[in-house]
């Protein structure tokens, strides 16, 4: 995986509404997250599998010790018996969103990226710059293969981020100016 794929996970903070439980079952429903910018410290990224009721999903798990995010938007469309229902959350239009000990399981991402003091190809178990891998299933993190490929960086900077993800967890989220909208039909965030 290339370093820019890792940015996918970093933006997932939009879905959080506070600290999540120590473990949870992944819904199997993807969501979109966009942001104008993300600055993070203590970055790690590795491949894993999320377990859902519909089977295993391959993901790029990204961990950040801390992240500051501007113009965050998260959108999900949920199929229901009465039609699609969308939920859109926005925060960080003025004061930045803050996330601590952030993990996100992502599948797709577009952004401009800069990595500082990056190591590519380190064993996942030997990462030291980010929060590191966790026991499979802990805080929504997928099962990884011990000794497998990972990358890490001291700091990261992403702009114009648009990503798809399955799950996010964090120790703490602060979402200034949080707004939520629920409506019939589909939802999409636009940078």
Language-model features, listed with the residues they occupy:
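N-terminal export and membrane-targeting signals
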Residues: 1-6
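Extended, solvent-exposed, non-transmembrane regions
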Residues: 10-191
């Amino acid at each position: 995986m290339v370093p820019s794929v890792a940015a996918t996970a970093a933006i997932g903070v939009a879905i959080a509404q506070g600290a999540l439980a120590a473990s949870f079952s992944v819904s199997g429903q993807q969501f979109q997250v966009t942001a104008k910018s993300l600055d993070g410290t203590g970055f790690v990224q590795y491949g894993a599998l999320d377990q859902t009721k519909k089977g295993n999903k391959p993901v790029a798990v990204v961990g950040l010790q801390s992240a500051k995010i501007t113009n965050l938007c998260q959108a999900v469309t949920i199929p229901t018996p009465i039609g699609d229902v969308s939920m859109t959350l926005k925060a960080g239009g003025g004061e930045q969103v803050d996330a601590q000990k952030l993990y996100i399981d992502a599948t797709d991402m577009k952004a401009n990226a800069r990595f500082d003091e990056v190591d590519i190809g380190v064993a996942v178990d030997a990462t030291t710059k980010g929060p590191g891998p966790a026991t499979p299933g802990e805080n929504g993190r997928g099962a990884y293969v011990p000794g497998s490929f990972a990358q890490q960086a001291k700091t990261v900077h992403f702009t114009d981020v648009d990503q798809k993800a399955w799950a996010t967890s964090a120790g703490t989220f602060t979402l200034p100016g949080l707004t939520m909208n629920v409506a019939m039909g589909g939802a999409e965030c636009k940078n």
